[in-house]
């Protein structure tokens, strides 16, 4: 009983976010667990690991196919960032709060995709603001860019920024951002391209909020790259090196050698992978790491032991042979 009362007391004492249109009396009533100093430290640390959060009922319901996480995985690989986790979650406040807090604490660089549109189910900004005890603030520069760059959609030819209408309120929701007044604006809001008004909103120093539209997601992440490169383990941005081998042998036949090889090269930071290709005549073996010179020296050995050859693209030497076992 006493434990439950204590838990209830802690819940009631929890601070809540405040919003631009509310009075200051509705602000934080207790010291936040998430401080500006913590966010500042996260925003400057070396980027070794990453996490990706795909937000959207439409993805979980099968209406939309998520391509952003696959693109982000390739993006991280090209920069030498170790992508540790991808999660797909619903447009649900509690899930967004829990996932963002957890990933922000666990990884150096986190992106979210989806849920920042004008409709009622676009709750990413509000949920992340709540997760980190921040207000939602109308960002004036983002609003100015929106007015200048956005084009009226079909059916909105008579839209006016000067009239207080439901359509105007819906548009404003897309530039009401989680915002910490104790941090520099440039550390919280980035415009990735001159022809885009959609901002990259950075929260708690490492949560980067992106739209779910693939072409915008990709363009904005590409525009962010120059800011990330100086913080990488390899500031030259060379990324990770991958060597592909095509083998006609079933996985069961090469498993012993690959196990021995993996143990031998682990201390060099090299991972050995084996991937069956169902319905194809050849399977794939990979070496992934940063020591290109050492990995290249292993090529003749691997080719010999898997009775295959190095390829540049998986499947480039496929034929019509039979299935291989997994």
Model-flagged regions — what are they?
Residues 1-49, 306-326:
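Eukaryotic N-terminal low-complexity, Ser/Thr- and Lys/Arg-rich leader segments
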Residues 6-7, 67-131, 148-151, 325:
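N-terminal small/polar loop signature for handling phosphorylated ligands or for N-terminal nucleophile
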Residues 41-86, 91, 293-300:
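Glycine-rich phosphate/diphosphate-binding loop of Rossmann-like nucleotide-binding domains
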Residues 43-45, 103, 169-170, 174-177, ...:
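Solvent-exposed alpha-helices and their adjacent loops that cap or buttress functional pockets
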Residues 55-57, 112-120, 211, 288-290:
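Glycine-rich beta-strand-to-loop/alpha-helix junction loops that act as flexible
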Residues 123-232:
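Proline/glycine-rich low-complexity loops and linkers
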Residues 205-303:
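An accessory alpha-helical subdomain
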């Amino acid at each position: 009983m006493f434990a439950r009362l204590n838990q209830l007391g802690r819940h009631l004492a929890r601070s809540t976010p405040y919003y631009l249109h509310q009075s200051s009396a509705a602000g934080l009533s207790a010291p936040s667990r998430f401080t500006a100093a913590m966010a500042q430290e996260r925003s400057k640390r070396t980027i070794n690991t990453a996490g990706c959060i795909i937000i959207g009922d439409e993805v979980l319901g099968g209406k939309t196919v998520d391509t952003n996480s696959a693109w982000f995985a390739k993006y991280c690989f090209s920069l030498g960032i170790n992508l540790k986790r991808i999660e797909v979650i619903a447009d649900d406040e509690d899930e967004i709060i829990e996932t963002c807090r957890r990933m922000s604490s666990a990884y150096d660089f986190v992106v979210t995709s989806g849920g920042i549109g004008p409709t009622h189910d676009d709750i990413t900004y509000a949920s992340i603001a709540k997760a980190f005890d921040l207000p939602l603030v109308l960002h004036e520069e983002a609003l100015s860019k929106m007015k200048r760059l956005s084009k009226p959609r079909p059916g909105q030819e008579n839209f006016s920024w000067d009239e207080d209408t439901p359509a105007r309120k819906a548009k404003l929701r897309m530039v009401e951002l989680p915002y910490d007044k104790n941090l520099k604006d440039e550390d919280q809001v980035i415009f990735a391209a001159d022809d885009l008004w959609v901002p990259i909103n950075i929260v708690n120093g490492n949560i980067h909020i992106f739209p779910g539209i693939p072409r915008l997601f990709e363009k904005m992440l590409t525009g962010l790259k120059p800011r990330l490169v100086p913080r990488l383990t390899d500031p030259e941005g060379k990324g990770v090196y991958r060597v592909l081998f095509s083998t006609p042998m079933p996985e069961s036949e090469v498993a012993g050698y690959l196990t021995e090889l993996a143990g031998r090269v682990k201390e060099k930071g090299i991972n050995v992978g084996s991937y069956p290709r169902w319905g194809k005549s050849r399977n794939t073996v990979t070496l992934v790491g940063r020591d290109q010179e050492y990995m290249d020296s292993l090529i003749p050995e691997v080719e010999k032991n898997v009775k295959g050859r190095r390829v540049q693209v998986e499947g480039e030497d496929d034929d019509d042979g039979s299935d291989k076992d997994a």
